[in-house]
Amino acid sequence: MNSPNPQTLSTPAGKVLCVADLRGNISQLNDLVDQTGAKLIVHCGDFGFYERESLNRISDRTLKHLVQYSTLIPPALRTRLLQSTVTPDSLRSQIKASTTPILSELPLYLTGQKSLKVPVYTVWGACEDVSVLEKFRSGEYTIPNLHIIDESATAVIDIGGVKLRLFGLGGAIAQHKLFDIGDGISTIAGGSGTMWTTALQIGQLVDTAQKVFDATETRILISHASPGREGILAQLALTLKADFTISAGLHFRYGISYNEFGVQGDQELYRNKLAIAQKNFMDMWEGVKAHVEANVSDEQRVLLENCLGVVNRLPAVNTLPNDKDEAAFKNMWNFNLPDAASGLLLLDINQGRIATETRSHGFNFSYRRNNVSLRSGSPAVA
């Protein structure tokens, strides 16, 4: 299911469904495929990589968060589970006793009781069980049509005259954890029901991208955290020569679509944004450098150098009209997705052209019709 070798899918013109934050409600993917006619799915985490045994590994705080935002749990049951009188032990007991999934539907897909209608390419999010991901990476767990995109596993999708190259980086971005793998046993990091990105993963992704580079491909960086908020991800997108970034993690009611040229006054402001990210990383790096360099293997040292190369990847101060950094500044497009329960993005690909369509349930403003104070002449502006 998941290997270092590139995965390839070839399909005629069609739609790519992009969603985020299923939070274990995996059946929603099939419903969305029926609604949109999508040929495949890109997912940005949180996917819901939890099994029944995960309950023993999740911290009380994370468990409460999962219950609060799960779309698997009926509202009345959620209200009962989150009552102040419910202790952490009682909450765990009720989840364990439930005959229907509360944490995730993943076990139903592992046993074959449920299946995915189309190929799904996903990264993991910030709330996942690292032990479950380790089982997928080792091959102990497999689900037909589920492909995990990470620092060493990439995919190519030949669709509608375009070759999409998918790169992925899952987990939260936490500066103080970039050199901590937590309970992970390989290169991925996590613990207590959460996962985060490490510096070595960033370095490995750069290595993977270099090995498979093909100028005829259209490159997409899929991440859980947003490159718009995390400068190191914006630097990574530049390093990978990404044409698109697709991310999640902000939980807005509407999707976001932008390029840096559209939101920055000039390229120098963009450079300053990345320079701040560089400084934050280097300040942290100076504190751990001696310890890390004394304990990494030769192979890890190469990956570490790759990561430092990303951190030091800043656009030039003065650029020529055809400079590659200026091209990225104007042409690299960024999408941040709402939760799957709130909206989606469709890439409609045909004859080499990638069209986009966004859908959102949006905000409900009907309450304003009943706002007596505004109707009676209150100021329209603050």
Provide a role label for each language-model segment.
Residues 25-156:
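Core catalytic region of metal-dependent phosphoesterases/phosphodiesterases
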Residues 119-121, 220, 225-351, 355:
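Conserved beta-sheet core of the metallophosphoesterase superfamily
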Residues 1-14, 19, 131, 333-337, ...:
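Intrinsically disordered, low-complexity terminal extensions
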Residues 18-20, 41-46, 76-80, 92-101, ...:
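Active-site neighborhood of phospho(di)ester-bond hydrolases with catalytic His/Asp-centered motifs
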Residues 7-16, 153-168, 173, 177, ...:
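Beta-strand-turn-beta hairpins that frame and shape the catalytic cleft
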Residues 29-33, 54-57, 134-138, 179-182, ...:
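Short coil/turn segments at secondary-structure boundaries
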